[in-house]
C-alpha cells in the first residue's frame, strides 16, 4: 500500500528519539535513469536529519518502483518522484501535494523532476564543450537556450581551467540533491524561504566540514546560487546538500508529537516559536 505524508506516532514513545510506527515512503519512478537514482534517493533521505529535531529517526524512506509493479506512478496512494521529459518546461522540479480540506493534513504528494534540468542546466560539459575541446553533441543548441546567465556563467569563468570529470560528477550530484531537497520540502508543507540566503561568512561557506552539517544557506527552500570558491581557496560544496537550521526548526514545529495537556502543549509550541528569529 501507499503512504500518507505524515507520521503520527513513535514506536517507542518513552525514548527522546524513536522510529515512527509508519514512516513516510517515497518511490522513485522506474523510468528514472539509473545514474541519477542515487542522488535522488540521497536528497530525500537527508530530510531524516531534520526529523530528528521532531523526535524521529528514519522518518522518511525511499524505494524504487519495480519494473513489474502493478501500480502506475500516478496512483495517488503512492508518493512518487516522477521522471518527466518536456521540450520547454517552465520548471526543473515541482513538488505538489494534496491535503484533507477539513484538517489541512497532507495526504500525499508527487514530485516532478524534469530531464532537461539534468541535461542542460547542470551538465556544464555539454554547455562549454568548445572551451573544453570536447566533441560536439546533439544537445548543444538546447543547452545554449537553457543557459542560466548568473551562477553558471560565474562557475565556468572561475573553474573551466580545472574542469575534471570528478568535478563534473560532484557538481551534478550536489545539484540533484539540492533540487530534491527543495521539492520534498514543499511536499512536507514548507513554503519558499527567500530570506535564508546568508548563513556563513566568506570563509566558512567554503568549509565542507561545516556546510555538510549545517548547509550552505539557512534553508533548502531558498533558490540558492552556485557556491564557487575564489582561486586561492579550496572549493567546498557547490550546492547545499542538507536541511538548514530553518528547515529543522520548521519540521520540529510541524511534526513533533503534541503533549496531551493543553497548557503544557501551548507552552511547548510557544517555546519553539520563540526561536523563529534565532541566528
Language model: regions and residue ranges:
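Structural recognition of the beta-strand scaffold that forms the well-ordered cores
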Residues: 25-28, 82, 107-110, 219-222
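The catalytic-center signature of Zn2+-dependent metalloproteases
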Residues: 64-85, 90, 174-230
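Active-site-proximal, well-structured secondary-structure segments within enzyme catalytic domains
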Residues: 14-27, 71-90, 95, 100-102
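Short, small-residue-biased leader/transition segments that mark boundaries at the very start
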Residues: 2-7
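Active-site-proximal segment of zinc-dependent metalloprotease catalytic domains
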Residues: 19, 28-36, 91-190
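Conserved catalytic/binding loops enriched for acidic/polar residues
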Residues: 166-167, 171, 196-279
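Loop/turn elements at helix/coil->beta-strand transitions in domains of secreted/extracellular proteins
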Residues: 22-24, 56-59, 105, 218
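Zn2+-dependent metallopeptidase catalytic core
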Residues: 31-59
Amino acid at each position: 500500500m501507499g503512504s500518507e505524508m505524515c507520521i503520527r506516532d513513535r514506536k517507542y514513545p518513552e525514548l527522546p528519539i524513536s522510529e515512527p510506527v509508519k514512516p513516510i515512503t517515497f518511490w522513485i519512478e522506474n523510468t528514472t535513469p539509473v545514474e541519477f537514482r542515487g542522488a535522488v534517493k540521497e536528497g530525500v533521505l537527508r530530510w531524516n536529519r531534520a526529523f530528528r529535531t521532531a523526535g524521529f529517526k528514519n522518518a522518511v524512506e525511499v524505494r524504487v518502483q519495480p519494473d513489474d509493479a502493478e501500480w502506475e506512478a500516478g496512483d495517488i496512494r503512492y508518493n512518487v518522484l516522477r521522471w518527466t521529459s518536456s521540450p520547454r518546461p517552465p520548471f526543473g522540479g515541482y513538488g505538489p501535494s494534496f491535503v484533507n480540506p477539513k484538517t489541512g493534513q497532507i495526504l500525499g504528494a508527487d514530485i516532478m523532476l524534469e530531464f532537461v534540468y539534468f541535461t542542460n542546466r547542470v551538465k556544464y560539459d555539454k554547455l562549454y564543450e568548445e572551451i573544453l575541446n570536447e566533441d560536439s553533441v546533439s544537445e548543444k543548441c538546447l543547452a545554449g537556450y537553457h543557459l542560466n546567465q548568473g551562477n553558471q556563467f560565474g562557475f565556468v569563468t572561475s573553474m573551466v581551467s580545472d574542469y575534471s570529470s570528478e568535478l563534473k560528477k560532484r557538481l551534478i550530484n550536489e545539484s540533484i540533491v539540492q533540487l530534491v531537497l527543495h521539492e520534498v520540502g514543499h511536499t512536507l508543507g514548507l513554503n519558499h524561504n527567500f530570506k535564508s540566503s546568508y548563513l556563513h561568512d566568506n570563509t566558512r561557506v567554503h568549509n565542507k566540514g561545516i556546510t555538510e552539517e549545517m548547509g550552505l544557506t539557512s534553508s533548502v527552500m531558498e533558490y540558492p546560487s552556485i557556491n564557487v570558491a575564489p582561486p586561492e581557496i579550496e572549493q567546498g560544496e557547490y550546492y547545499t546538500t542538507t536541511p538548514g537550521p530553518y528547515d529543522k526548526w520548521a519540521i520540529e514545529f510541524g511534526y513533533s508529537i503534541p503533549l496531551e495537556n493543553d497548557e503544557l502543549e501551548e507552552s511547548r509550541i510557544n517555546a519553539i516559536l520563540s526561536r523563529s528569529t534565532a541566528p
